[in-house]
Amino acid sequence: MSPVAKVSEFHREGNDWFCKTGLSSDITVVVDDVKFHLHKFPLVSKCGKLARMYEDSKSTDKQSLWTTVLEEFPGGADNFLIVARFCYGARVDITSKNLVSIHCAAEYLEMTNEYGEDNLISQVETFLHKHVLRNWKDCILALQSSSPVLKSAEKLQMIPKLMNAVSTMVCTDPSLFGWPMMMYGTLQSPGGSILWNGINTGARMRSSGSDWWYEDISYLSVDLFKRLIKTMETKGIRAESLAGAMMYYARKYLPGLGRWQSGTSDSSKSRRRVVSFNLAKASSPSSMPPLDQIALLETILSLLPEKRGRSFCKFLLGLLRVAFILGVDGNCVKKLEKRIGMQLELATLDNLLILNYSDSETLYNVDCVERIVRHFVSSLSSSSSQLPEFSPPSLDPVTSPSPAPLKKVANLVDSYMAEVASDVNLKPDKMRSLAAALPESSRPLYDGLYRAFDIYFKEHPWLSDRDKEQLCNIMDYQRLSIDACAHASHNDRLPLRVVLQVLFFEQMHLRTALAGGLNVANTETAHAVTIPGGRTGQEIVQRDGWVTVVRQNQVLKVDMQKMRSRVGELEEEFQSIKQEMKKRVSKSSSSMSSPRLVKLGCKFLLPRASDAKNDTVQNSVSSTPRSATADHTLPRSSRHSKHRKSFSFFG
């Protein structure tokens, strides 16, 4: 009786495997230093490769015991043991977990129907088409288990078939076929209720969302995940769904990325965990290949679609932060910065605060943010740099860029500068370069930039007036609000030159406001006078209302005339102070200790406080509010307060 006809048992002794058939072994097969002492007939009758090797060895080797070594056998010794059992007639359980590895081994040994009816390759392909390709869970498990033999599986058509099947299931409504309903471990009644032992429990199955498959494909290796995403792209799956799968995969394997992303609710987590219990053993650390996080980040970046979105921009900023932590290649960082810059108006301050992980002394990576801002500015001038939205609100093409994104980014940059201004190691040139990265038209008001500079001056009291003036020169004082001007005029952290310029432009604002108020009052009075008197009750009420308005406007007009007169008086006092200071400057110009002159934005000169003396200027204007301007013996805070008062129209 041949060994195949007997019920064969395999046992191991050390590093050798033996088959109990009652006959002595006449062939030794070595796989990964493991020896299998077997018999020629069952192996040669099923394996075309071994049959050919045996025929070649008979002409050269006359020994009764034949030894052969199988190099790079797919799946190793454990997989060859399964094939050997099949050759000896033992029943082999083909599952979705060992399907790919057995197929690779059968192809390696050429186990076709030519060497036996219903050979191993035929059985594997039958199981694939009848059971695996129709079931989501089996497809995912088969793909995941193919990682150890992926190099050999590349030559087969099984991997593309599995990926096409998975992509088709993702494109299709899962409730139509029941796959993924069966993966929850429960059955459904025709009405949708969950069945337990055939009994209707009354509980309803939670409907699966569009992201139900994210968790399952996250168990795949990086290479398989990349190939699957590309296959899904060819199937026409929406870019939003693919981006969501990639974001989910990256958060799972990149350290710290999940902390900076929005959390997932418990309900969505339970909805996504379709086959997590079935994959628990297969996805253990021992079975998962070692993950190269830098390669993963670069792979994710290469797969991400060229789209824009609020959560997508947040994810890109998280990737950039992780890239700095891992120390990835500079080209990868540049690509991330450029893609973030093209949608910077969708970012938030929290995501933009990227810590400095290099040897720099600054706490935050200000250079990176500046590069992102410059990418944003350059993208506005190029129509080809405009990224499409994931879900555009309308189908109308955008013909011209809206000024709103520029304003949003300006507010974001000003808030960022106010946040990083407290860093004592932040140099003035960094602040100046970041503030100047945006064009002047981006800021309708400079209040945010003024606030950032004020915080910076407070945390850096050792700065010289020259450094402060260089920073303040970026601001347009005409675009400061009344409140900001009022604060700046009392701010003892600002240089004297800046304070006087702010006071000058504040006066211009007030004069413009007064002129506008007078024009409005005159217009309303003219309209009120021309209203004809009527005899109906409604017209009488309207006439009385206009009479009241006229009286109020007349009172307002008188008050404004008084204010205008007061402004004239202040201007005369201002000119007298200016002439007096010119005389003092001409007298002291010949001395070696002559005071340094400060050129004002409003075209007049003031001596430094350190060179001023209490002389005739104080006496000449002591009875006016301007007298405090020449009182150089007061501290800086008092001087600034007096400057503010001197330009007040109501003091």
Swiss-Prot record:
InterPro entries reported for this sequence: BTB/POZ_dom, NPH3/RPT2-like, NPH3_dom, SKP1/BTB/POZ_sf
Span of domain BTB: 25-96
Q: Which Gene3D superfamilies match?
A: Potassium Channel Kv1.1, Chain A
**Role according to the record:** May act as a substrate-specific adapter of an E3 ubiquitin-protein ligase complex (CUL3-RBX1-BTB) which mediates the ubiquitination and subsequent proteasomal degradation of target proteins.
What Pfam families does the annotation carry? BTB (PF00651), NPH3 (PF03000)
Q: Which PANTHER family match?
A: OS12G0117600 PROTEIN
**What region holds the NPH3 domain?**
211-509
Residues annotated as region Disordered? 611-651
Read off the SUPFAM superfamilies from this record. POZ domain
Q: What SMART domains does the entry give?
A: BTB
Q: Does the keyword Iron-sulfur apply?
A: no
User: Any domain commentary?
Assistant: The BTB/POZ domain mediates the interaction with some component of ubiquitin ligase complexes.
What keywords appear on the UniProt entry? Ubl conjugation pathway
What spans are recorded as compositionally biased (Basic residues)?
637-651
Tell me which family the UniProt entry assigns to this protein: Belongs to the NPH3 family.
Part of which pathway? Protein modification; protein ubiquitination
Q: Which domain of life is it from?
A: Eukaryota
Q: Does the keyword Acyltransferase apply?
A: no
Q: Where is the composition biased (Polar residues)?
A: 615-627
Q: Name one GO biological process term.
A: protein ubiquitination
Q: What is this protein called?
A: BTB/POZ domain-containing protein At3g44820
